[in-house]
C-alpha cells in the first residue's frame, strides 16, 4: 500500500516537505495618498484600508516597518483634476511629493509608483479623450512624463497600469533619456477588464465618468491574448510582469511562469480583498485561513511577489508562526 499520510503525520513533518511558502519579503502593500492636511479617510468598501495625507503617512509607515513588508505601491489622489490629468506629471504633485517624503523617512522601503492618468483626469479614463475616444498615441508622452517625474522624486520602480499600446516602450525610452536607465518597470501586462476593481475605484476616486475600460484593458475570456500582451511588454523593456486580478486568473499566471523566465507579480485586487473581509465580518469564514490559502495559491501558480491589501496582516501572522 502507498501511504502518503506518513509525511502528513505532524505539523513539523509537513513543514519539512512543504513545497511552497510565502514570506513578508514577497509582499507589496498598496498605499493611497490624498492631497490635503491631517487626513485619514477610511475606505468603506475596503475595511482596514485608508487614504492618508502626507502629514499622516508616518503612522502607516510605522505599521509597514513593524510588519517587515519591504515594498509599497503608491496611488495618488489629487485635489485638482482636468481633461489631461496634468497633476499626474506635475513635478510637485501628490504622488511625487509622497515619494520624496517616504524616501526621506524610510529610505530602505522599495517605493513603486503606479503610472496611470485615471486618478488625475476629470473623466476618470486612463488617457486623453477626443469625441469620446481614448487616444492611445497622444497619451503615451503624458505617461512617459509621469514616470520620469516619479523617478526624479526617488521612486525605486514605476508600474504602468494604463494598458495603452506601446506604453512600456515609451516609458523605457523616456526614463533612459532622462538618465534613469536603472529604474525598473513593473508592467501591468495582463490587466483584465474586470469586475473586481470596484472598491479600488472608490479608494482612488478613479471610476470612469462614462463608458468602461474594455477598449484598452484586456478581455478576460482570452488567455492566449494575455500571453501576447505579456510578450509585448517584455519585448518593450518590462522587468517584472503583473497579472491582475490574480485569483480568477491563476491559469494566466501559471502559463506565464512556464513560458517566460521574467519575475511575475500577482495583484490580489480590491474586490478579492473586500469579499474576504465581508465574509469574515459575518463570521462565515476564518479570515486568516482563507487569506493564507489565497497567498499560497498565487505563489504556487508562479508569483514571486504579491501586491495585496492583506500584506500587513499576512506579515504579522507569519511572525506568530
Question: What do these predicted ranges mean?
Answer:
Residues 1-18:
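N-terminal amphipathic/basic leader segments beginning at the initiator methionine
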Residues 10, 22-28, 34-321:
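Alpha/beta enzyme core
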